[in-house]
Every structure is written in structure tokens, then in C-alpha cells.
């Protein structure tokens, strides 16, 4: 399974990704995305995850193959 | 505030790195150890593997694996000896760079073959003496590869490996995202090897005396000696050397013994964990595992019974919260909140649910930063909540056991 990776040095914490991917992410106390589970992306959510990655305004969100991250 | 006094070598449990005259001079070093044998990178890697040498900067990662990852890059690496030692309770790297710097520089040469740039990253205070020593070594034909000195700023995270690599590349000493590992591609694109100075000093010994000799100290799973900085309620705080698995009581005895009855000991430093003050406890990963601890970079802080472990942890958490490199939201926001929540508990401003809130915040920040600063801070706090469980209960009823102990 691919995984979501957040570059925390870039993320601006407005929580767009948590809105687009509520199955996987919630906003924490400050608006930064927090994983509901372990950040792995089930195949069914892959398209939504890709969309969240594409729309991240800070280019902070990535999808990574299992080996890395 | 616990501070590390000047750390003279000489007290020991088992001296190796600090077994010599410790005057930092090249002639005494050569008289004691002789010249470094000339070894190829493969041989160095093999020796490090046979010896089971692991990193002494905190994470305990096998050296040979990092060497082989960097070699696999197939490009000339940047090699950094990390002497930053940002941890306030640690004095062992400074002691090593003062008393046995030639071992560090020998070890650096062993991993520097074929590198495009070789750096000793250390606090500015030591640079003058190190500069002179590097010149003397070059003049004596000891160093095949020239070494550049780069200043490590005085900040807790300045010694984190990607922060060190950034500083060496001329940028600010702040950690970077880890999606691409620096052993693959560091700041300038080159594979980057960052090793703690003590790790390199051990390598210099292994190159001379062999992997078997190295393994004669420590345990079968965790071979070799390590430098420990022992402070807190001990008669003579300082740096000692011992094999992994040494009894906690022996380390404390080597620092003059406890100066008061102890209630707990912080092992592994500000990112480490509290363990019971049991003299027989083996200081090794295996021995400390039940407490979620590890020897880390060898920091040992003895807590006297009349000091409150929650207060001490809150103080450290406050310090750590002040050291966040203002980059990552969960760390920048979470660590100060965590520290202030713990401080409320420590200062008897109890509210129902306070311990649960500390626990929630510690979980919330874990794994959510570019570096492991939030993880280490959370680990310390989790361990405090376990080790000082009785204190937590007392604080919730408005009492402090340490204050009671003072009478
Ligand atoms: C916040 C933080 C601070 C660190 N500071 C130091 C340091 O001052 N010196 C050091 O050698 N390693 C430090 N480390 C560990 C390094 O990232 C790295 O693991 C180490 O230098 C690798 O060398 P070693 O494998 O020889 O231990 C720090 C890690 C973190 C997360
Ligand atoms: S969309 Fe991007 S910048 Fe916004 S919170 Fe998510 S990861 Fe951070
Ligand atoms: S996790 Fe914290 S200390 Fe580490 S880089 Fe991010 S803000 Fe800095």
C-alpha cells in the first residue's frame, strides 16, 4: 500500500487535505493533518489521496511507495 | 538546572577511548596507538560490521549499514563528524574532542576515502585547538584527506543529522524533511554520511586492535564501550567510560557515588527515559527496554529523592519546547502546549483529566515533525508519567511527595 507523507517543514496547516480525505486524516488542535490510522492508503482511497496531493497548496503532501518514507 | 561540570577523564569503569594521557597531543597519541593502518573502504566496512559498532550519537544505528548505503550511491559523498552535542546534560563529545581528538580524526580519515568534502562539525569554542591539531596532522602526513571545520551552533537540534548537513552546506542548522534520506542525497545532492565523533573514535580503535578486541567489552548483542556523562545528585559529575551492560550503580559510583538518596535516574538524556534508581540495572538497550529507554548518547542524570521528578521533567520539557526549530506545525504548537500542561501538573495546578491530556498531547506530536525532536520529547514525558505515577496521583490531590520528603 502507498503511504501519505507530510513534509512538516512545508505544511501550512490550513487542513485542506483533511477535508478532502476525511477517511484518512483529521485536523489536529492547530489545523495540521493527523492520521486516523497509520497513513497507509487503501487502494479504494488512492484516487482521493492523489487529488489531495495535487491540491495541497504548499506541495507538502506526497504519496510514497511502501519501501521509502 | 542540572549542568555538566567540566568533565575530566580519569574515572572509569573500563577505559579505552580515554585510556591514554588525554593531553590531546599528536605525539602522545602516536606514542600510544601508532599510525593508523591504511585500509580500503571495504575493509573498514567489514571491520565495523564484525565489531558490531553502532552509532554513539543517540540512535544506535550500525555504522557499516550507513557506510554501505553511502557507498551504494556511487557518488563522492560529503562526510561529517558530528561533534555538535546540543544536549545540555551531555559533555562526552566535548571531552573526547578535548582529551582524545586524534582518535576522532583518525576515525574520520577511515570513512573519508573518496569523499568530496570532509568536515568536523563542532562548537566554535574548540576550533582553535582543533585547527592547530589538523595542521600538525597534515604536516606529519597523517591525513590523506583534508578536513574542514564548521561551527555547530549552540542549539539542541543543531546536531540532528540533516541540520548538521545543512550547516555544512552553508545554510541554517535546522533539520530537513526525510522523504529522501541524506545517505542518498543531502543538501547539495551528494550522499551524506553523518557520524557522531565518538563512533569515529571507536572505529579508529577497531582499525588498530581489531573487531575481536572491540567485542571483549560490552555484551554479545551490544559490544564495546561507550562514554557516559553522569550528572545530577552525584559527588563528582563528569564523563566516564564503560562497556554496554554496565550496572547503573557502577556508572554512578564512577562519578563519585550518589550524593543523596535517589528516586530515579534519567538515562539517555532529554530524549531518553526515567528508570528506577536500581544499582543492578544493566545500561544497555536490552536492559533498559522494559522502561522504554536506551543508553542513547550516554547521558545519565541522578534525581535525588527530595527533588520532584515531575517538576524536573516539566523543566526539561520547557527547555525542549524552547528549542523547536520553528518549522513544523505539530512540533511548534504541540511541544509548548505539552510543556505547559505538564507544568500545571507539576506545580499542583491540578485539573481532572490533566494526566490524560498530557498523554494525548504526547501521542499527538509523535512522528509529526521533520526530525525526531517531538518523538524524543514525547518519549521522555511518557516515561515520566510511568516512573512518577505515585507523584502524579499525589499531585492530583494537591500534595508533592518530594516536598513531603524534605520534611
Ligand atoms: C533533535 C536531535 C538532536 C541531535 N543531536 C545530536 C548531536 O548533537 N550529536 C550527534 O552526534 N547526534 C545527534 N543527533 C543524532 C543524529 O541525528 C544522528 O543520528 C547521529 O549524529 C548519527 O551518528 P551516529 O550514527 O554515529 O550516532 C540528534 C538527533 C536529534 C533528533
Ligand atoms: S493541504 Fe498540504 S499544506 Fe494544507 S494541511 Fe494538508 S498537507 Fe498541510
Ligand atoms: S520537528 Fe520540531 S525540532 Fe524538528 S525540524 Fe520540525 S520544528 Fe524543528
Feature names for model-found ranges:
Chain B
Residues 105-111, 243-259:
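Short amphipathic, charge-patterned alpha-helical segments
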Residues 77-80, 84, 97, 101-112:
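Glycine- and Gly-Pro-enriched alpha-helical subdomains that act as flexible
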Residues 34, 39-46, 51-54, 87-88, ...:
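Small-residue-enriched alpha-helical segments and adjacent helix-cap loops
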Residues 1-45:
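Cofactor-/ligand-binding subdomain signature composed of acidic, glycine-rich
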Residues 34-45, 74-77, 93-96, 122, ...:
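Ferredoxin-type iron-sulfur electron-transfer modules in oxidoreductases and energy-metabolism complexes
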Residues 49-70, 155-166, 321-333, 369-381:
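Conserved phosphate/anionic-ligand binding catalytic regions in large, soluble enzymes, centered on
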Residues 29, 80-93, 184, 229-234:
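Gly-rich Lys/Arg/Thr-decorated short loops/hinges at beta-loop-alpha junctions or inter-strand turns
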Residues 126-244, 255-259:
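Hydrophobic alpha-helical positions that pack around
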Amino acid at each position: 500500500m502507498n503511504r501519505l507523507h507530510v513534509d512538516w517543514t512545508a505544511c501550512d496547516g490550513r487542513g485542506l487535505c483533511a477535508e478532502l480525505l476525511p477517511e484518512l486524516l483529521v485536523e489536529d488542535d492547530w489545523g495540521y493533518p493527523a492520521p486516523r490510522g497509520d497513513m497507509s492508503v487503501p487502494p479504494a482511497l488512492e484516487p482521493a489521496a492523489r487529488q489531495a496531493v495535487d491540491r495541497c497548496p504548499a506541495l507538502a503532501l506526497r504519496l510514497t511507495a511502501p519501501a521509502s518514507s | 538546572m542540572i549542568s555538566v561540570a567540566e568533565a575530566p577523564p580519569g574515572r572509569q569503569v573500563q577505559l579505552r577511548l580515554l585510556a591514554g594521557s588525554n593531553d590531546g597531543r599528536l605525539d602522545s597519541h602516536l606514542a600510544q596507538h601508532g599510525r593508523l593502518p591504511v585500509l580500503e573502504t571495504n575493509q573498514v566496512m567489514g571491520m565495523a560490521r564484525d565489531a558490531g559498532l553502532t552509532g554513539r550519537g543517540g540512535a544506535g544505528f550500525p555504522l557499516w549499514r550507513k557506510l554501505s548505503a553511502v557507498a551504494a550511491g556511487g557518488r563522492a559523498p560529503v562526510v561529517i563528524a558530528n561533534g555538535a552535542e546540543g544536549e545540555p546534560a551531555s559533555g562526552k563529545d566535548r571531552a573526547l574532542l578535548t582529551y582524545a581528538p586524534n582518535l576522532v580524526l583518525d576515525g574520520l580519515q577511515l570513512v573519508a576515502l573518496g569523499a568530496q568534502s570532509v568536515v568536523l562539525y563542532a562548537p566554535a569554542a574548540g576550533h582553535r585547538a582543533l585547527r592547530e591539531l589538523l595542521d600538525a596532522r597534515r604536516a606529519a602526513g597523517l591525513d590523506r584527506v583534508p578536513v574542514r571545520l564548521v561551527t555547530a551552533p549552540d542549539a539542541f537540534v543543531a546536531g540532528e543529522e540533516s541540520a548538521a548537513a545543512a550547516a555544512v552546506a552553508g545554510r541554517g542548522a535546522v533539520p530537513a524533511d526525510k522523504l529522501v534520506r541524506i545517505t542518498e542525497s543531502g543538501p547539495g545532492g551528494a550522499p551524506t554520511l553523518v557520524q557522531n565523533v565518538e563512533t569515529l573514535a571507536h572505529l579508529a580503535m577497531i582499525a588498530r586492535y581489531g573487531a575481536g578486541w572491540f567485542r571483549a567489552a560490552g555484551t554479545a548483542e551490544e559490544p564495546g564501550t561507550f562514554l557516559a556523562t553522569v550528572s545530577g545528585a552525584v559527588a563528582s559529575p563528569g564523563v566516564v567510560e564503560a562497556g554496554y551492560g554496565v550496572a547503573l550503580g557502577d556508572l554512578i559510583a564512577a562519578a563519585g557515588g550518589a550524593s543523596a538518596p535517589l528516586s530515579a535516574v534519567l538515562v539517555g538524556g532529554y530524549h531518553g527515559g526515567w528508570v528506577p534508581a536500581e544499582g543492578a540495572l544493566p545500561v544497555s538497550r536490552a536492559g533498559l527496554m522494559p522502561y522504554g529507554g536506551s543508553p542513547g548518547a550516554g547521558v545519565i542524570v541522578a534525581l535525588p529523592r527530595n527533588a520532584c521528578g515531575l517538576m524536573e521533567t516539566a523543566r526539561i520539557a520547557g527547555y525542549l519546547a524552547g528549542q523547536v526549530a520553528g518549522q513544523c506545525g505539530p512540533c511548534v504548537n504541540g511541544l509548548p502546549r505539552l510543556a505547559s500542561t505538564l507544568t500545571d501538573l507539576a506545580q499542583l495546578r491540578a485539573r481532572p483529566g490533566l494526566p490524560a491530556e498530557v498523554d494525548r498531547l504526547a501521542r499527538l506530536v509523535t512522528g509529526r515533525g521533520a526530525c525526531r525532536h517531538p518523538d524524543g520529547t514525547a518519549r521522555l514525558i511518557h516515561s515520566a508519567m510511568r516512573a512518577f505515577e505515585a507523584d502524579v496521583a499525589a499531585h492530583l490531590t494537591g500534595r508533592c511527595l518530594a516536598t513531603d520528603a524534605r520534611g
